């Protein structure tokens, strides 16, 4: 108690106290561990400030530098705050807040003097570890965070180890045990603690917006093929549909202006047409008697509210809805991994009767634009009896004429871009052909629109789920035919049928395929066994997303219903108490076992037998008597000088209390011999 009061007084004065070398070294390593993952989303100078402050603190510990003066600290705080505000794109963004937290952590590290300061720095480390999960929730980051937590906890442990020569490995081992002991209770809270919606929230970052955009210029879809990032994963309740049926509808492009297709507004549309999540809509297609295709999608962050679904989609998940043009949307932008269920009715007919306002919208064309294409369409329509004949003639024209499917189409101007593609370059990607077909159909009065989304995907053989990547981005056309409603037409299948049946790689030329493989991970596909390993790792990440990251209120409710039957607060509370009791019981059992192992130290057993034998002759050890004090009292009884017993006491204390001393056979033999000689001497004197 006196020692604790002395330490508190010294720390209050701010002098004399030195953070243990073991703890400070671990704290330096922990600083690097917790800050390093944030380098991907904060400005580099913040990382540099953190490293500089860490070096400064180490130099202070070695006595080469001094603590910063007050005016220097004020200058550093003001400059850092201004720097964070200026370098951030949004003053109120999560990236800016995280950067400010890291800067504050680094600056506090420099002025750290007392144990209380060290406590604050360590707790800031825990907050910085947790902040990383706001940006990345992958299994790799979770494992990394666990390792970082062990280092931070080891620094915490080091603050309370009084020995001057404690190895860092000892602190790390103790910290690892503490973290592992917390895992069972963490699992109980994760599984059973209610998912309560926050009272307020800020948009979570998901990185730069990637994937399909709300407007498409010629070449935009081709640019997406440069990325093999995952767009979403899909898990089907039954067999996965074949490749040519996997059209994932995302956006509907109805407006064309200066060579760009965009979602645009809805001219002359009746009022009250917005999609309402989870509310019935009068424009839902009739689907009675049609077997649904049920599946769930795990969508990566897009920063937008549009979702991707197979036609014709029916929303199932709360917070999703079907729009008037049969797109699936979420009630809020997708900033984190978003899981939703849907049902597809491929045979359902949409808009058998097309409203006049919608017909006007889907037949609009800019005036005095692409005159050659309009003339071509009207001449072809004059030789066609029905709209179906006209569309078939367009597809036949694409097949027979020298059109080429390529990743690197030539640039087209803003004006007359359809003319330039259809008659001059004849080289394009999916959006070129889909846009041309829609323009030709509208030129002769056939309602048509471009659809943007993804097509195909790769089936993971380990788990059977479908993986759709950014290079699966695709655009196709949708035309309205009398009596048939909206019908999908994909002109890419006419110029490059392998794209629809076998994927993008099979449809490209050798040159384009080489470019694609150099940019994406497909360049590793030829290495024997590597693709199977990548499938295994991807399946692990998928299970993590499905069971851990995607563990939301709906999944928790289903899990509790399967476990408890009727879900009531009482039953959930009982399960949490039982689970928490078992978890804490395991910790208590571990502590009891460790105490037992300490009591069973070979030196402790030898001393205990010695004390028991002396107790039989009237020299019992007192309850509050240390082994050294007891040996000294025994030595007094036999009337010998204290110097004679001192080596034996020192040897016993070193074996019991010094972690750097190993209890070898020779050391134990020496202890037992000394205790035996002392026992014999005392026993003989007692009998005399």
Task: Place the predicted regions along the sequence by residue.
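Transmembrane-cytosolic junction motif
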Residues: 587-609
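A cross-kingdom signal targeting lumenal/periplasmic-facing segments of multi-pass membrane
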Residues: 81-85, 246-367
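Juxtamembrane membrane-insertion context
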Residues: 275-287, 351, 365, 402, ...
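Linear, non-domain "peripheral" regions
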Residues: 1-210, 317-339
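Membrane-proximal, non-transmembrane interaction modules
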Residues: 452, 471, 492-493, 581-583, ...
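Short, surface-exposed glycine/acidic/tryptophan-bearing loops
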Residues: 67-73, 333-335, 341, 345-375, ...
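Membrane-interface segments at or immediately adjacent to transmembrane helices
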Residues: 178-269
């Amino acid at each position: 108690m006196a020692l604790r009061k002395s330490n508190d007084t010294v720390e209050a004065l701010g002098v004399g106290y030195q953070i243990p070398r073991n703890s400070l070294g671990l704290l330096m390593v922990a600083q690097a561990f917790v800050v390093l993952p944030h380098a991907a989303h904060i400005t580099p100078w913040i990382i540099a400030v953190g490293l500089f402050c860490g070096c400064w603190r180490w130099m202070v510990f070695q006595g080469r530098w001094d603590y910063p003066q007050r005016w220097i600290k004020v200058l550093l705080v003001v400059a850092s705050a201004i720097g964070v505000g200026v370098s951030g794109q949004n003053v109120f963004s999560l990236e800016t807040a995280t950067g400010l937290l890291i800067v504050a952590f680094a600056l506090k590290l420099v002025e750290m003097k007392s144990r209380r300061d060290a406590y604050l720095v360590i707790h800031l480390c825990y907050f910085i570890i947790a902040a990383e999960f706001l940006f990345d929730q992958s299994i790799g980051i979770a494992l990394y965070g666990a390792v970082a937590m062990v280092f931070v906890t080891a620094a915490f442990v080091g603050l309370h180890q009084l020995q001057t020569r404690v190895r860092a490995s000892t602190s790390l081992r103790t910290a690892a045990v503490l973290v592992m002991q917390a895992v069972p209770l963490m699992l109980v809270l994760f599984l059973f603690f209610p998912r309560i919606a926050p009272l307020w929230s800020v948009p979570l970052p998901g990185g730069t917006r990637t994937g399909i955009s709300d407007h498409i210029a010629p070449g935009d879809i081709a640019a997406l093929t440069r990325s093999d990032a995952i767009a979403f994963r899909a898990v089907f309740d039954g067999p996965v549909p074949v490749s040519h049926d996997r059209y994932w509808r995302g956006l509907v492009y109805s407006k064309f202006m200066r060579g760009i297709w965009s979602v645009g507004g809805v001219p002359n549309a009746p009022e009250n047409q917005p999609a309402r999540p989870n509310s019935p809509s009068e424009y839902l297609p009739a689907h009675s008697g049609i077997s649904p295709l049920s599946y769930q999608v795990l969508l990566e962050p897009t920063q937008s509210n549009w979702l991707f679904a197979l036609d014709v989609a029916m929303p199932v998940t709360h917070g999703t809805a079907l729009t008037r043009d049969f797109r699936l949307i979420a009630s809020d932008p997708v900033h984190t991994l978003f899981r939703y269920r849907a049902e597809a009715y491929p045979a359902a007919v949409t808009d058998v009767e097309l409203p006049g306002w919608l017909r006007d919208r889907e037949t609009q064309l800019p005036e005095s634009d692409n005159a050659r294409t309009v003339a071509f369409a009207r001449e072809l329509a004059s030789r066609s009896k029905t709209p179906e004949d006209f569309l078939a003639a367009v597809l036949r024209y694409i097949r027979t004429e020298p059109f080429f499917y390529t990743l690197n189409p030539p640039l087209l101007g803003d004006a007359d871009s359809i003319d330039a593609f259809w008659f001059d370059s004849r080289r394009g990607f999916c959006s070129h052909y889909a846009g041309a077909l829609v323009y030709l159909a509208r030129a002769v009065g056939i309602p048509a629109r471009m659809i943007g989304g993804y097509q195909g995907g790769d089936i993971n053989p380990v788990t059977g789920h479908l993986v759709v990547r950014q290079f699966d981005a695709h655009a196709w056309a949708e035309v309205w035919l009398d009596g048939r409603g909206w019908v999908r037409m994909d002109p890419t299948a006419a110029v490059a049928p392998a794209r629809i049946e076998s994927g993008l790689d099979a449809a490209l030329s050798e040159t384009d395929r080489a470019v694609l493989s150099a940019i994406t991970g497909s360049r590793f596909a030829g290495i024997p066994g590597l693709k199977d390993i990548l499938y295994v790792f991807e399946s692990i990440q998928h299970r993590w997303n499905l069971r851990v990251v995607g563990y939301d209120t709906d999944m928790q409710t289903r899990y509790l219903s399967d476990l408890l039957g009727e879900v009531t607060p009482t039953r959930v509370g009982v399960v949490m108490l039982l689970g928490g009791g078992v978890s804490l019981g395991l910790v208590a059992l571990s502590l009891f076992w460790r105490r037992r192992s300490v009591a069973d130290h070979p030196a402790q057993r030898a001393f205990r037998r010695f004390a028991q034998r002396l107790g039989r002759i009237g020299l019992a050890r007192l309850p509050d008597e240390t082994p050294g004090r007891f040996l000294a009292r025994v030595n007094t009884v036999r009337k010998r000088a204290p110097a004679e017993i001192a080596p034996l006491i020192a040897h016993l204390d070193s074996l019991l209390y010094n972690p750097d001393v190993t209890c070898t056979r020779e050391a134990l033999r020496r202890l037992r011999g000394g205790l035996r000689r002392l026992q014999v001497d005392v026993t003989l004197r007692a009998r005399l």
